[in-house]
């Protein structure tokens, strides 16, 4: 148990082959196909998957022409479902497409006849961004480590290091922290959970041994592991049936994994399958940009940013900043709010232009998290120079 001066917090991650993540990637692959030849495409694409079936449905208005079947099958192939013996096969799965055009009621209220800068929010809602200085990524340690384990399992499987490893996998990490007046200090890794799909012909003993050698040790700094760290490696004892055969998948089923692993807050709106006129996505990216900029510039050790919108209205209804009491240099949260408002234009059209969100960059956001990644296309991860 953690001492009275410390706390335990847990985050989870899933591989790109988890059925919900498969659906996220299919939805975003379709979004990218739309944006590739029509940057102003309006896309709201949902995906569902189950044994031998992928269904995409929603509303899309685009000038792009592409083969839905090809996009979906290539995405499923990249994810790793290449043979029916592992529960799903991109070559033979049934694909259903039920796509209509965007509602004209939404179009007239949001973008028709309006300049880019005056673009209205695509819906109402509230979105959050979070940042913390506990890792170089300015992300929570629990989330970083859980994600790193999934990334490593993808490397191991793609490089055929463990022949028995199959695509579906989940991780979970509990970290013991010390809270120093709102600043979180990671002390040690308390518990590690890994569940990975496997072939019939491998023993649990072999799975646990090899996960420790090939996944955990290469992924986690040694100083965070100690003799008291608890490991639950394939604790169910059997995980042969996985992917959509094991459970149904839906777009937006892993919104906490997509963001901050349970830290901060979440407005409830998923990201994948939505073009940037949907503030569920674009404003959440902007809120992360603000939070990371505040922390990276040393104005706070932690930051939570909330923005809210009404459909068809370009300016946000509210902006909120909470530093958890960690504002630096004698500043207050009110000071950080003023700095945020003076440095960031949170109208949807300005967010889209500043972060170049009309590019086809979204499929790769749909696995291993939208935040804390070193990718030059993810402009919301580049701290802005702040004037104050």
UniProtKB/Swiss-Prot annotation:
Residue positions binding Mg(2+): 12
Alphabetical keyword list: ATP-binding, Magnesium, Metal-binding, Nucleotide-binding, One-carbon metabolism, Potassium, Transferase
CDD domains named among the record's database cross-references: S-AdoMet_synt (cd18079)
Catalytic activity as recorded in UniProt: L-methionine + ATP + H2O = S-adenosyl-L-methionine + phosphate + diphosphate
Binding positions for L-methionine per the UniProt entry: 59, 102, 278
Cofactor binding note from Swiss-Prot or TrEMBL: Binds 2 magnesium ions per subunit. The magnesium ions interact primarily with the substrate. Binds 1 potassium ion per subunit. The potassium ion interacts primarily with the substrate.
The protein's Enzyme Commission number: 2.5.1.6
Gene3D superfamilies with a match to the protein in the record: 3.30.300.10
SUPFAM superfamilies: S-adenosylmethionine synthetase
Binding site for ATP: 18, 168-170, 236-239, 253-254, 270, 274, 278
Cofactor: Mg(2+); K(+)
Entry's transmembrane regions: none
InterPro entries: ADOMET_SYNTHASE_CS, S-AdoMet_synt_C, S-AdoMet_synt_central, S-AdoMet_synt_N, S-AdoMet_synthetase, S-AdoMet_synthetase_sfam
Gene Ontology annotations of biological process type: one-carbon metabolic process; S-adenosylmethionine biosynthetic process
MF GO annotations: ATP binding; metal ion binding; methionine adenosyltransferase activity
Binding site for K(+): 46
One Pfam family matching this protein: S-AdoMet_synt_C
Pathway it works in: Amino-acid biosynthesis; S-adenosyl-L-methionine biosynthesis; S-adenosyl-L-methionine from L-methionine: step 1/1
Family note: Belongs to the AdoMet synthase family.
Function comment: Catalyzes the formation of S-adenosylmethionine from methionine and ATP. The reaction comprises two steps that are both catalyzed by the same enzyme: formation of S-adenosylmethionine (AdoMet) and triphosphate, and subsequent hydrolysis of the triphosphate.
PANTHER family listed in its UniProt record: S-ADENOSYLMETHIONINE SYNTHETASE
Protein name: S-adenosylmethionine synthase
Organism: Acanthamoeba castellanii
Gene name per UniProt: metK
